[in-house]
Design a protein with these regions (language model features):
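Short, acidic/small-residue loops that bind anionic groups at enzyme active sites
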Residues: 88-116, 124-129, 287-300
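Extended hydrophobic packing segments that form well-structured cores
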Residues: 24, 363-466
Length: 466
């Protein structure tokens, strides 16, 4: 659940009754969207709003008391509002969270001194003061909006996603299990740049994980539990039982590392050492983790899993790591995404466990069981790629939306036909800017909230494709 502090702005010589009714309208909308609110009781200030130095202090103290709960702050203006009281509240609270500034519509039939809001004008003053105070803020899509309207509803959902992303990345701890595959320079990244953004990388040698896994007994309680979890997660018909048991042991070892290091996501060296020296692929385990909202990326793609984690935080749904992989006939706006795969099963129409056809020819089919294969179900999706630009010392990203079409292909692995408007322009951007071929995706529409979080609040270099 997202938690917002709420500031209702009031200016003394404007009609306070608008704040009383406006406050309740806004709170009702937030409750409808299952957003928890932190706000003083209505009788604690005039109209339950903020208009004076004393009011600002009261609200700042309330917000400080709940600072570990509050994900963001909504500033709403049922009338002109007192810009100083609003800015002082935020400064003294010291929350350092996203802020959304909203203003009510005036109605042409109620423009007398008794009912005129002037929120249209007051919003400019509030934003001017926030800028003077050095407080970063977001805006609604329309300059003024009715709380009960579809625009405000969409803006609240977008802002909640922004808040969740900013919160999620603060102190995020990500596990890198194994070195990157030697042939994949494309997944290089700067650990130091991520650290400056509050994202810590915990490394673990692949041999340490395999050491734990190989010491486990088939009858170990944790292994039995994981084995049952795998068999309940996907169809394993035709897969050797020995391979599934090996997966279970590997899963126990990985989860031990996650728990000990308090991780929120992992990236794993998935080829070819695991197959050569242990005898399975980790795809099913990674699929299960991602489906359970513990994102896991293949090929030790750390910035790839950062993108997955961002998408998951924004949407509350599983995210996957995919290759932008193929054209789709001659349609310039369609293509095919693919991985071997470790996609979360919620992405698929139907899925099953299989073997990794690409590397089976090198290491033997018997050593490559454990992929999750199928066709991605039709529906909208948001994609995101995060990358560290080491030459310029910054973190950059691109984000956009598209649609999985559900069209089927005679192919292997986990795949999906997709459509993105102006796809060729996006591909030109990816190649010109030297981005990786991996992209994260989630089956939700959350690009706007992610763009706001990364560019406005984290100050990353972000391209929004539309």
């Amino acid at each position: 659940m997202t938690t917002l502090g709420v500031i209702v702005g009031n200016r003394g010589f404007f009609p306070a009754h608008l704040c009383v009714t406006g406050r309740q309208e806004v709170l009702d909308v937030l409750a409808k969207h299952h957003i928890k609110t932190i706000i003083l009781p209505a009788d604690q200030t005039n109209g339950g709003a903020v208009e004076s130095l004393a009011d600002a202090k009261k609200y700042a103290e309330l917000f400080q008391k709940h600072r570990h709960e509050i994900d963001g702050v909504l500033v709403t203006l049922p009338n002109f509002g007192d810009e100083r009281a609003i800015a002082n509240t935020l400064r003294w609270a010291g929350l350092n969270v996203p802020v959304l500034v909203h203003a009510f519509n005036d109605r042409t039939q109620t423009m007398t001194i008794k009912d005129r809001r002037d929120s249209f004008c007051g919003k400019m003053s509030a934003c001017n003061n926030l800028r003077q105070y050095g407080i970063t803020y977001s805006l609604t899509t329309l300059h003024t909006e009715e709380p009960g309207g579809k625009e405000f509803s969409a803006d609240i959902q977008r802002f909640a996603a922004t808040c969740r992303v900013v919160r999620a990345l603060k102190g995020a701890r990500i596990g890198a299990i194994g070195a990157r595959p030697g042939a994949f320079n494309t997944v290089r990244y700067s650990e130091k740049l991520l650290e400056t953004a509050g994202i810590s990388i915990e490394t673990l040698d692949l041999s340490e994980v395999l050491g734990v896994a190989t010491k486990l007994s088939d009858t170990d309680a944790a292994v039995k539990e994981k084995l049952a979890g795998i068999q309940g997660y996907t169809a394993t018909g035709g897969i050797p039982q020995l391979s599934v048991i090996k997966m279970a042991k590997l899963g126990v070892a990985i989860e031990k590392f996650i728990k000990e290091r308090e991780l929120v996501a992992t990236a794993i060296q998935c080829w070819t050492a695991l197959e050569e020296f242990y005898g399975v692929v980790p795809c099913t385990l990674m699929s299960m983790m991602s489906n359970g909202l513990m994102p896991s990326a293949c090929e030790t793609d750390i910035t790839g899993v950062v993108g997955m984690y961002i998408l998951q935080a924004a949407s509350g749904k599983p995210a996957a790591l995919l290759d932008w992989n193929n054209n789709y006939g001659t349609d310039p706006d369609k293509g095919v995404v693919f991985h071997c795969s470790n996609l979360p099963k919620d992405f698929f129409e139907s899925q099953k466990m299989d073997y990794q056809e690409i590397i089976a020819g090198t290491v033997g089919r018997e050593n490559t069981y454990g992929t999750i294969v199928g066709n991605i179900a039709a529906g909208p999706f948001t994609y995101c790629r995060v990358s560290t630009d080491d030459n310029n010392g910054l973190i950059r990203a691109y984000v956009g939306e598209g649609e999985f079409t559900g069209e089927k292909l005679d192919t292997f692995g986990g795949y999906g036909v997709f459509k993105v408007n102006r796809l060729q322009a996006l591909l030109q951007f990816i190649c010109r800017e030297g981005y990786e071929h991996h992209v994260a995706a989630t089956k939700a529409v959350v690009a706007a909230g992610i763009d706001d979080a990364l560019s406005n609040y984290l100050k990353w270099d972000v391209y929004r494709h539309e």
